Amino acid sequence: MPARASRPAPGLPARAGLGFKPEHYATLVEQPPDLGFFEIHAENYMVPGGPAHAQLAWLRERYAISVHGVGLSLGGHDPLDARLLAGHRQLQRRYAPDSISEHLAWSRHDGRYFNDLLPIVYDDAALRRVCAHIDQFQQCLGQPILLENPATYVRFEASHIDEAQFLCELVARTGCGLLLDVNNVYVSAVNHGFDARAYLARLPLAAVGEIHLAGHARQRDAHGRAVLIDSHDAPVDEAVWDLYEYTLALTGPVATLLERDGNIPPLAGLLAETGRVTACLARGLALAA
């Protein structure tokens, strides 16, 4: 097994967290759970007021907060959207979140927005472009961000840099951290036939400031081959739990978010899964001692 990475810089507490869902708010107020943090999607709060901000203010008084962006299109060719940058800055000033993150993906091209996180070509031009966009975002905020590794379903012949090396270069050149989505690693590994553990061992694990866990769906492509989809609509798969435990053996305890964006169960069902996260983190802490 590769040597354990040094611990990431302080940010979110190394505990279990949940993505906040407004339908759970009444239950949260009635009985606040023992969690380390909640994560919100930035674009849902880029309005001046209303119930969403009242709920977020309540959460911020009681929990650490992770702000996760989905729309900046850091991997795209278009300039970054000035309105989204301003919205991120306003959220940062208003709530002082413990972490701000975005994706290694694109969703805008030629002024048009696509409601998806699309893969990029891993080449020198893309590396320079993504570095420039990360630098611009970090300068806007005045702090480093975390960048999430993608789940992918296609590869490009034009790519000549391995994804793990691409992420290493981004961290080295921009000073950003990593949001390590373990489900994404597993999904991509199955779809492309690579070794997930070998991929993890090649990442700059000391830069990991947050981990994501989620469920995926199994489908078939036009040729009948199995394809995993990062769907966030099911419990975490056992294979992903195994990969998460392996990850913690490398990183030590890291703030870990349970994501659920479809087929959302009552809060109690999600808390049962976060209980398993807490147990894994405790084992990781024991290994680190």
Swiss-Prot record:
Domain of life: Bacteria
Cystine pairings recorded for this chain: none
SUPFAM superfamilies with a match to the protein in the record: Xylose isomerase-like (SSF51658)
Gene3D superfamilies attached to this UniProt entry: Divalent-metal-dependent TIM barrel enzymes
InterPro entries, per the entry: MbnB/TglH/ChrH, Xyl_isomerase-like_sf
Family: Belongs to the UPF0276 family.
PANTHER family in UniProt: UPF0276 PROTEIN HI_1600 (PTHR42194:SF1)
Database matches in NCBIfam families: PRK05409.1
Name of protein: UPF0276 protein BP2925
Species in which this protein is naturally found: Bordetella pertussis (strain Tohama I / ATCC BAA-589 / NCTC 13251)
